[in-house]
Amino acid sequence: MSEINKDDIKQEVFDLYDDYAHDRIDRRTFVQKLSIYAVGTLTVTSLMSFLMPDYKGAIQIKADDPKLKSEYITYQSPKGGGTIKALLSIPVGTKKPLGGIVVVHENRGLNPHIEDIARRFALPGFITIAPDALTPLGGYPGNDDQGRELQSKRDKKEMLEDFIAGYDYLKTHKDCNGKVGVVGFCFGGSIANLMAEQVADLSASVPYYGGQPPIEDVPKIKAPLLLHYAELDTRVNEGWPAYETALKENKKEYTAYIYPKVNHGFNNDTTPRYDKAAADLAWQRTIDFFKQKLK
């Protein structure tokens, strides 16, 4: 990232990036509107460089980390996109079956950041699978703009089936103990909410700033929920009060946290929306939750 100070950037700039990252405005409009904030020493180029993901620089667990066995596999999703590619990660030296975690990507396919996240989740003692919903269209193209464009062409219900099929694959894996949870970010958070409603034997669900599921389906939820929201994420948070009311009325097991003064995407350490304090706290809560529910 550049040497721009995050605290010097107006909230409107982060909101503008959120609009762009979620396809509410195109790249041309994003650049045009961003120019309004290019004053003094700030240029559009420097702001763009500051806001865009730095995947290479943020990798924490490399693909060849000796503590993990990470490999690409394929599985079948007959109700979804057919053959789906995924990253499967297992701690080396595992002597007993482990709890499983399905890691669901954002709205741009299985990019390097989510692969890294999947490896991070495996290290504490889980077997993880991170499917790529873009597989039927050739897979993550190596560019987020193209990834978002490709993902917008897929049917969300079919993509949901792809992740449910990934759950089924993991649940019956020889190194899994049969207890499987799901964690998702942004689009993936909405999938985690939907899986809580549609997968009867799901052991745990952790949506990070994910859109809420249909309220009328809340009675179907059996999995315990741990929900992470960002205070400044007004778009996603708008649906939370009604969702929480339904969870309470139906006596569902859930814990929700709204992290103060942070943006949508606060866990993503490849962009300046990242907030280390909130991300670390949410991460530890998530690991503790999975350790409790997937043992």
What are these regions (language model features)?
Residues I164-K222:
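Primarily recognizes the serine-hydrolase "nucleophile elbow" in alpha/beta-hydrolase
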Residues Y55-T94:
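N-terminal cap/lid segment of alpha/beta-hydrolase-fold proteins
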Residues R108, L134-K157, G265-T270:
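Cap/lid segment of the alpha/beta-hydrolase catalytic domain
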Residues R27-M52:
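N-terminal export signals
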Residues L227-Y229:
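Short beta-strand/loop motif that positions the catalytic acidic residue
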Residues P97-E106:
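Short beta-strand element of the alpha/beta-hydrolase
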Residues E149-H173:
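Alpha/beta-hydrolase active-site loop
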Residues M1-T29:
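N-terminal secretory signal peptides
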